């Protein structure tokens, strides 16, 4: 009897050992365990935990929170139109466009031109406030259309758009920029130094900072065409030309500072400035234009670079 029990125990132990080392037996046990868990869940006895490993699957993704879609709204844009082939004088034309708060006045002009009136004429290029080609007068203030956000205006009232003042009007929002660039070229806006250097011309941080502000000019003409002196006297050099002269007058590498000071020491030069700060307010690059003009005046009187 004892011998029989020992044989049975040996048999059971052998079967257990066989199952522990048998892969098919392990797989069967895993399936049985999964089935048991599923039955427990169906019976409401437990809640399954999310799988954490690659073998068991990935965690359940969290549903995204719904976001309200941005809503458009109507905006009335009134543009001062002028076609030299048809009009004797400029005229105001109303346009209603659907806009979003994050859009810009340039987007409104595009929408009008592409969807309502393809004859509308205006300049634009980069649309990122770098080229300076889309300067215009918006609600009585010179701005770049690509930087004027709709949300910054009271859209319960019309937005008025017209060409910048003081330069010859060609069509709609386009003016003749040649008088502006003539003044710019006259102040010799380029580095002038004698001889070829043996190595690059170095500057200290302080020397660079001396004229850093005026290097930001993008020649958009917003400052010059906001100047009341320029409106009444188109021969005045204007703020933009003086700003670009400042950029080289105070450059330690340049040797023609006095040449530019002599050019600006003219009845149409810096002394025509009346310090109204219109130019500083209009500059889309944040240049302290009035300050730069004052520094050129002081350099002209003292004969030295500040």
PLM feature spans:
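Eukaryote-biased recognition of intrinsically disordered, low-complexity regulatory segments
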Residues: 72-94
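Short, structured protein-protein interaction patches enriched in aromatics and acidic/basic residues
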Residues: 126-135
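Ferredoxin-type iron-sulfur electron-transfer modules in oxidoreductases and energy-metabolism complexes
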Residues: 102-118, 157, 162-306
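Glycine-rich phosphate/adenylate-binding loop and adjacent beta-alpha elements
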Residues: 138-161
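Short, contiguous acidic and Ser/Thr-rich linear segments
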Residues: 91-104
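N-terminal intrinsically disordered, low-complexity tails
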Residues: 5-71
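Short strand-turn-strand beta-turns centered on an Asx-Gly dipeptide
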Residues: 80, 98, 137-140
